[in-house]
Amino acid sequence: MDISASIQAANQLDLLRDIETNANKFDQLHIDITDGHFTDNIGLSLDIVSKLKKNTSYKLDVHLMLQENTKFVERVVEYGADLVTVHCESTDINEFKNLTTNFDNVGIGILPTSNIEILKSYAEYTSIFLLLTVNPGFSNQPKAVNLIDRINEFKSVVNNSESTLIVDGGVTVDDLAPLETNGVNVAVQGGAIFGK
């Protein structure tokens, strides 16, 4: 299982140094881009993707929490994103089908409050799934769902051993072993890596 470091929780005034200082704790970088509409917060700029691509050698996992996704997927891919996740709550199935036709490595995310059954229709077009386990937009929040219960719900809907499963939100050091045992491929950590 890989660890993806959520840079939203890092020191924004000295980001590259904070990444370097904690480099032994993660495998890739997770970049949350929010718009103040899908979430109650405005997050990182799209430019951070190109800056991190130029200044680090990490795989960049970009998590878009936006009302409008298509033009921003195109931009973050141009800027160097290796994987992009959009949300089923703001991306209908036709838009998502077009995204996966035009771009590689586009995944689908789901909020902790949404019915997991929604993912069935998206599974035809992607094998990358992100289970958000906190309410979106802010770092260092408590979990909104039980991680293992949510994973089991996911497995009951998407039965694909080739899937890449990402769990994002409130993941502690103690959660890592159970997540790996339950088939999670990528665990996103913010506060657990960079501190609170």
Write out the residue ranges for each language-model feature.
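Short, aromatic/basic amphipathic alpha-helical patches
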Residues: 98-100, 181
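Generic beta-sheet signal
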Residues: 6, 63, 109, 132, ...
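Alpha/beta catalytic cores of nucleotide-metabolism and tRNA/nucleoside-modifying enzymes
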Residues: 156, 160-167, 172-196
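Glycine-rich phosphate-binding active-site loops on the catalytic face of alpha/beta enzymes
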Residues: 84-92, 130-140, 182-196
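Conserved N-terminal beta1-alpha1 strand-loop-helix module at the mouth
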Residues: 1-85, 91-94, 98, 106, ...
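Internal catalytic-core helix/loop-beta-alpha segment
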Residues: 105-113, 130
